Amino acid sequence: MQAQEVRLLYLFREDGVVTNDLEARVLRKITFRIVPFIMLLYFIAFLDRVNIGFAALTMNQDLGFSSTVFGIGAGIFFVGYFLFEVPSNLILNKVGARIWIARVMITWGIVSGLMAFVQGTTSFYILRFLLGVAEAGFFPGIILYLSFWFPARRRAAVTALFMAAAPLSTVLGSPISGALMEMHGLMGLAGWQWMFLIEAAPALILGVVVLFFLTDRPEKAKWLTEEERNWLVKTMNAEQAGRGTASHSVMAGLADIRVIALALVYFGTSAGLYTLGIWAPQIIKQFGLSAIEVGFINAVPGIFAVVAMVLWARHSDRTGERTWHVVGACLLAAAGLAFAAGATSVFMVLIALTIVNVGISCSKPPLWSMPTMFLSGPAAAAGIATINSIGNLGGFVGPSMIGWIKDTTGSFTGGLYFVAGLLLISAILTLILARSSPKAVETRTANQH
């Protein structure tokens, strides 16, 4: 086994030692086949979702948008996302990941490109809403898809690898977006128009690639040997059967109080994530920097977030502990936002944004490992989509409140404190959920061999 493969498999073992040759071989194959590709998909998804933050550096002035108008427009994406999330994930569960994820990517690529032709407030709101509709189902669809392939005791680690694409999107996408903004005037288009057009293209291309590359279920994986395929199918079926009292119906997934609790936890983390993604460029630019300088500075927090996320998820899987891994990360992010509210220099802002990015990124893998511990089948599709759709409304509330408070007070300070408060509430709700339903959030028993 090559050294890089051993290092990757270390993420999936409690003690870092691969003891089962068949398990090791299967995990290696499905990890290298699936994870890098879905990371690339999420990289593009997150970039197209938050590149509006860079567009705002000149678009707001070009189109006469106030901070309130921009905040609402940036956040209204999540209203469309909310309304169509559950239906989209149920369709994915019915028709298969390959076809539905391809549809999602192609339609969001088209709408993302159309953002280059925004003329005013109305078209801005409509296209951002439609982008949310188009992208609905992608993220929870991937979470559901991973639950078809990876055992629960390994899922936080693989989820961390997938989710690392978000901070990586900031690391690589920020300088790219900043550079594209400098294309202002080329062929009569503004820099922000070029940015939308160019960054929409990968989604269209990858949407077609998905049709030929993704495999819906382990049973159809011709790239596994018969022995490997049988082991994986048997393992995943045994895990699902072993849930015993797990909820299976769509209504069970929608009505489960634990689903609602996790959705509210995710609401706070989403508010923090998209406040960071959408407003960070303007928070940095207020110190008099160019678009390219903003891009490079905005990339730095993501570097630390990628490393921290993978290590944090590895520790969560190794210990089988989820609750405090979510709580601690939320508290760290809240502290970072409070620090950012009082920052008086670019260096202080950079430190604060790094703390926020690390905290929010670390909260996600253990959080998203929880719902599939008590949901399966159609209930998992509905429950995961419900958590994501309700939770992502935080992506509307956070950025919108930041814009309104900035217009009202002339400062980002109050808005940053507001979002920090939401993250504090997320931490408290996680503790309440763990106390009332410990089996829903911990995997210690699954990790005992």
Swiss-Prot record:
The domain of life for this entry's organism is: Bacteria
Q: Does the keyword Zinc-finger apply?
A: no
The conditions that induce or repress this protein are given as: By tartrate.
GO annotation, cellular component aspect: plasma membrane
Q: What membrane topology does the annotation report for this chain? A: Multi-pass membrane protein
* Residue intervals passing through the bilayer: 34-54, 64-84, 99-119, 130-150, 156-176, 194-214, 259-279, 292-312, 336-356, 367-387, 414-434
Name the keywords, alphabetized. Answer: Cell membrane, Membrane, Plasmid, Transmembrane, Transmembrane helix, Transport
What is one Pfam family matched by this protein? MFS_1
Localization, per the record, is: Cell membrane
Q: Where is it chiefly localized?
A: membrane
Q: Which InterPro entries would you find in this protein's record? A: MFS, MFS_dom, MFS_trans_sf
Q: Which PANTHER family match?
A: PERMEASE-RELATED (PTHR43791), TRANSPORTER, PUTATIVE (AFU_ORTHOLOGUE AFUA_6G08340)-RELATED (PTHR43791:SF36)
Sequence similarity: Belongs to the major facilitator superfamily. Phthalate permease family.
What does the function comment of this entry state? Answer: Component of the tartrate utilization system and may allow entry of tartrate and tartrate dehydrogenase.
- What this protein is called in its record is Putative tartrate transporter
